[in-house]
């Protein structure tokens, strides 16, 4: 089904262009739906990263992924929220379990060889995170966002789905929220 991590290294030794990944993991109000972009220093992802970080707006505050305060993952990763943050409990899930889960998924992707360690200082990642207003279980938020981020990174690096895979599903696709 998916290319093994070691094979990814043979396919992509250098990240020279922007790549896109997506993953949906979990269920209920803690469901994680991750969209992300990965790109090289000097590219459009870096420009979007800097612009987003410099221009927060009410209910949408970009934040750096951190393993813990003062420890960012490498590649440097920016988290943006898909849903307007309306209350303190929703903010606490974003600025806590989701933030840490994304950072851990990025570092595990480097450790697993999915993201090239030798380029970690020259890659930027933007991760769009969904935290539903009714989400409450911080452990599920962490688990689902960790798994979804890892899967989205792998899909981006593998170029998945391929055009052929998307064409094969176009008439039978079943979106869980449609």
Curated annotation (Swiss-Prot):
Binding site for substrate: 35, 64, 82, 84, 99
EC number of this enzyme: 4.2.1.147
UniProt-annotated catalytic positions: 33
GO CC annotations, alphabetized: cytoplasm
Coiled coil start-end: none
Pfam families the record matches: Fae (PF08714)
Keywords assigned by UniProt, alphabetized: Cytoplasm, Lyase
Catalysis: reaction(s): 5,6,7,8-tetrahydromethanopterin + formaldehyde = 5,10-methylenetetrahydromethanopterin + H2O
Cellular localisation: Cytoplasm
Annotated InterPro entries: HCHO-activating_enzyme, HCHO-activating_enzyme_sf, Ribosomal_Su5_D2-typ_SF
Record-level Gene Ontology MF annotations: carbon-nitrogen lyase activity
GO process annotations (BP): carbohydrate biosynthetic process
SUPFAM superfamilies per UniProt: Ribosomal protein S5 domain 2-like
Domain of life: Archaea
Family per similarity comment: Belongs to the formaldehyde-activating enzyme family.
The protein's role, per its UniProt record: Catalyzes the condensation of formaldehyde with tetrahydromethanopterin (H(4)MPT) to 5,10-methylenetetrahydromethanopterin.
Protein's name according to its UniProt entry: 5,6,7,8-tetrahydromethanopterin hydro-lyase
Organism: Methanosarcina barkeri (strain Fusaro / DSM 804)
């Amino acid at each position: 089904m998916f290319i093994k991590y070691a094979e990814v290294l043979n396919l992509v030794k250098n990240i020279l262009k922007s790549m896109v990944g997506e993953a949906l993991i979990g269920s209920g109000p803690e469901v994680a739906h991750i969209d992300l972009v990965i790109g090289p220093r000097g590219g459009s992802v870096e420009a979007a990263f800097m612009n987003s970080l410099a221009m927060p707006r009410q209910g949408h505050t970009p934040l750096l992924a951190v393993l813990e305060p003062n420890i960012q993952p490498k590649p440097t990763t920016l988290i943006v929220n898909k849903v307007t943050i309306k209350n303190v409990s929703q903010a606490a899930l974003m600025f806590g379990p989701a933030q840490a889960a994304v950072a851990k998924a990025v570092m595990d992707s480097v450790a697993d060889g999915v993201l090239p360690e030798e380029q970690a200082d020259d890659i930027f990642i933007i991760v769009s995170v969904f935290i539903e207003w009714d989400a409450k279980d911080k452990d599920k938020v962490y688990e689902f966002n960790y798994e979804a981020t890892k899967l989205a990174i792998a899909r981006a690096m593998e170029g998945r789905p391929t055009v052929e895979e998307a064409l094969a599903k176009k008439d039978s696709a079943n979106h869980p929220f449609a």
